[in-house]
């Protein structure tokens, strides 16, 4: 390390990788966050990508980013502003400069700052020559040229060579934070095991970026972020959507029930459906419905026949599910509706996060239709809240809304893998043949009715959205009975509010 290189000890620091969609910024950011987690840092991440499948290259609308917040304590958020920004082209700089702190180190790919790219990004002149950057430590590096130089004898075509340039930037960042390239080298060799020439090229460029940063002393600062003091255990990096899916798997195991997910794909909730679709080995059934209404209705049907049933969506989909959610309230069937919130209203901001669906979750149904609402606060505790949402739904025979959001769902953090024995049992109250069954006879403690599965002799009863007579379950239009049932449904949910979930909450730092 050069004597001119300043070593700065930091409690925490935010790094933002940005470039065109297709520049590999998501992979680059994920690799750095994984390496930081393996080092022992607290980590929180957030991918930032456009709603369009592929906006025109070099435009601000096509910029993809990945933000990583690391620290020597557990980290709860991906951070507000970046201390280090990697911008692979002018559009990435324009889109992300406002998220860089004054004095931030900005590494730019100088090769991308052509007149054409500068114009496409919306600049009137080269921003690298503008006073707008005078408050930042700008490090211009010919990343594309240096990548081509490293691979000139590789035998790869030009397109394949240029694709490796994100690894050069990652190598520089690894040096900047005193991290080894070992984790990413192993990842590349495993990922491209059947394409050794691609693996070799990416590893060579990764090491070239690291060596360039260490030898030419282009970077004037070197950051030191010590490992965090965390509870001992086995950890992995997990996104909120994956943690949500796993929480439901754990709940199904504890309840000894099959798990069913009926959903329509919607950003940013789709990963939950995709994760559960991989777990047929655990008896999970998934159904990709033709629309939001079909998704929730299949889940209500699955609940009726004895499954732990869930449906996943975001704000616009929650609006479409509202009538069927009211059916689940009226039928008093267990169901979990997961709302991974995004910016609204209407289509809104599909890939941006927002927490604006609370009132819709509480009141967005016709009539008086009370429903418990629980909300996660970190990617990791999405597991806990999914588990508890399922437990509440099953033991209290009610639909439940679980609120997360785009940051929680797509963001990631180190997560201590729990033991199922540390979680409480989940006890479905299922009526059996020979019971003196009354459809709306209630448990005196919870006011929950019994779960009667179709096909069980002697448990035939009416089901559906029409009001029922208390206890007997006959259809009724009598106002006095409707008031009784309305009060009972309200009282049942009010009892749930007394549950203490404090033991699954995490301390705030």
Question: Model-derived features: where do they sit?
Answer:
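Structural beta-sheet core signal
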Residues: 108, 311, 337-338, 402, ...
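Active-site cofactor/cluster-binding pocket
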Residues: 2-255
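Flexible, low-complexity linker and terminal segments
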Residues: 238-247, 255, 385, 390-505, ...
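A glycine-rich phosphate-binding loop feature that marks nucleotide/adenosyl-phosphate handling sites
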Residues: 49-50, 205, 226-230, 264-268, ...
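Gly-rich Lys/Arg/Thr-decorated short loops/hinges at beta-loop-alpha junctions or inter-strand turns
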Residues: 51-52, 149-151, 218-233, 251-258, ...
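Conserved thiamine diphosphate
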Residues: 133-136, 140-146, 352-405, 425-433
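Thiamine diphosphate
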Residues: 12-100, 164, 246, 251, 259, 341-368, 483-505, 509, ...
């Amino acid at each position: 390390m050069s004597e001119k290189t300043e070593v700065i000890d930091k409690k925490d620091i935010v790094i933002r990788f940005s470039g065109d969609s297709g520049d590999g910024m998501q992979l680059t950011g994920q690799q750095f966050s994984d390496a930081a987690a393996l080092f022992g840092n607290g980590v929180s991440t957030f991918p930032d990508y456009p709603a369009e499948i592929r906006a025109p290259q070099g435009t601000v609308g096509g910029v993809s980013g990945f933000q990583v917040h690391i620290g020597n304590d557990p980290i709860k958020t991906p951070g507000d502003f970046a201390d280090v920004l990697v911008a692979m082209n002018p559009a990435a700089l324009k889109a992300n400069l406002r998220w860089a702190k004054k004095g931030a180190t900005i590494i730019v790919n100088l090769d991308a700052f052509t007149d054409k790219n500068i114009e496409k990004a919306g600049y009137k002149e080269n921003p690298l020559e503008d006073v707008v950057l005078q408050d930042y430590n700008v490090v211009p590096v010919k990343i594309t040229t240096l990548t081509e130089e490293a691979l000139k004898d590789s035998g790869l075509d030009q397109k394949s060579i240029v694709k490796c340039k994100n690894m050069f930037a990652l190598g520089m960042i690894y040096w900047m934070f005193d991290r080894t390239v070992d984790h990413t080298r192993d990842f590349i060799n495993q990922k491209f095991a059947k394409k050794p020439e691609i693996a070799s090229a990416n590893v060579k460029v990764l090491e070239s970026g690291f060596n360039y940063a260490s030898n030419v002393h282009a970077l004037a600062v070197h950051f030191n972020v010590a490992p965090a003091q965390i509870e001992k255990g086995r950890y992995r990096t997990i996104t909120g959507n994956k943690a949500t899916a796993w929480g439901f798997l754990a709940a199904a195991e504890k309840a000894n029930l099959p798990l069913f997910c009926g959903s329509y794909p919607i950003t940013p909730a789709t990963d939950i459906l995709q994760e559960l679709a991989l777990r047929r080995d655990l008896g999970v059934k998934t159904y990709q419905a033709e629309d939001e209404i079909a998704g929730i209705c299949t889940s209500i049907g699955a609940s009726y026949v004895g499954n732990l049933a869930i449906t996943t969506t975001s704000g616009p989909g929650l609006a479409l599910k509202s009538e069927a959610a009211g059916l689940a309230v009226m039928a008093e069937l267990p169901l979990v509706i997961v709302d991974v919130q995004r910016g609204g209203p209407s289509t809104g901001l599909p890939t941006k996060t927002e927490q604006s669906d609370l009132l819709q979750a509480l009141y967005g149904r016709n009539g008086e239709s009370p429903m418990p609402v629980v909300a996660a606060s970190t990617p990791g505790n999405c597991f806990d809240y999914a588990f508890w949402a399922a437990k509440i739904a099953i033991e209290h025979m009610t639909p439940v809304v679980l609120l997360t959001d785009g940051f929680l769902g797509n963001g990631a953090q180190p997560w201590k893998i729990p033991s199922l024995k540390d979680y409480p049992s989940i006890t479905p109250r299922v009526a059996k043949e020979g019971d003196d069954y009354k459809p709306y006879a209630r448990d005196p403690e919870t006011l929950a009715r019994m779960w009667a599965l179709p096909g069980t002799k002697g448990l035939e009863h009416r089901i559906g959205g029409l009001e029922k007579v208390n206890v007997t379950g006959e259809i009724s239009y009598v106002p006095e009975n409707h008031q009784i049932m309305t009060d009972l449904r309200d009282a049942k949910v009010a009892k749930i509010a007394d549950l203490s979930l404090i033991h699954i909450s995490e301390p705030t730092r």
